[in-house]
Structures are given as C-alpha cells and as structure tokens.
Amino acid sequence: MDQGTIDGVDVAGNTIAAVCHVPGNILEGNWTAAIFVNDTASDAQEKALLKVYTGQAGGPIAELAKLIGKVVSVERAPITFDIVGAKGTLKIGTDYYAELEPYVGPSGAQTTLSDTVFSTVPGAPVFVGKAPVYRSKNAAIGIDVNLKNHNALQSTFRFEA
C-alpha cells in the first residue's frame, strides 16, 4: 500500500499477497489460497488488511475474494518486490520467488495486448513477457513448481476509495 487507512488504521507501507491454486477457469472460482502479510505489519494493520482482502469490507476487492473457496493459511513473511523499468522480482518468504520481464518490439516498446480476453484485469492492457524464474512451494495448496523461461502476463490496476 502506498498510502491509506482502513477503519482508522494507517496501512501505508504494508503488503499483502495471496498464493493460489486455480483448479480450472480462473473466473469460476474455487481457488485454494495461502495469504501472506508482510512481517513488519502490526497486529492492527494485519487485521485491517485481512478485513479488506477477505471481502469483509465489501467493494471491488470483495468480488475478487469471492473466487477463493478455501484459505489454507494466513502467515507473516518478508515480502519484497522490486521494479526497474518493466522488469520485476517478487519474493514472499523462502518458498515463493518470481522474476518477470516484458517482451519488447523492434522500437523497444513493451509488447502489449489490448481489448483481449487474455487480460486478467478487464479493460486494462496486458504486457506479454516471460518469467526467467518462477518458484512456488506450498504443500497445503498442492503447489511445488520450479519453472524457467515460462510465459508471463503483466497488467496494472489501482483501487481507490
């Protein structure tokens, strides 16, 4: 969160992440999820973030939360993400790590899909790229993958209230 409060609790500087198993069509739901809150959040900040991201506070995030059928854990972990240009890395604890980088065209611009059903964020462009590294391991979710140079789709979104 760059800035913001939830029920009077300042949540700026905090991160929440979900690692999910999606058993089929992403929009049909029944996802299994492990939820992570950054390890520097206070108990009050964690409670406030979970209220929003589990859908209890309503709004657009509640619609997203409806897709999760089962939460197997809520954990504290270091969560880091670094973005340099259009390349980025994400690390959650010791069991999740991803690198993403875009494909670029001859002009150096990112390869973009617009007005496509392949967007995970309706109405937003999709940036096509690859994940040089993607590792994810969680026995409760049934995930244990270590992929190299796999496809990756990136998009942007912003929630404001």
Residue spans for each PLM region:
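N-terminal ordered "arm"
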Residues: M1-T5
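Low-complexity, acidic/polar, glycine-enriched regions of mature
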Residues: I6-C20, I35
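Residue-level signal for the start and early helices of compact helical domains
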Residues: D7, I26-E28, V72, K148-H150
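Short amphipathic alpha-helical surface micro-motifs
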Residues: T15-V19, V72-S73, K137-A140
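Charge-rich, amphipathic alpha-helical segments
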Residues: V22-N25, N30-T32
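Charged linear interaction tracts used for macromolecular binding and regulation
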Residues: W31, I35-A124
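Extended, charged low-complexity segments
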Residues: E99, Y103-A161
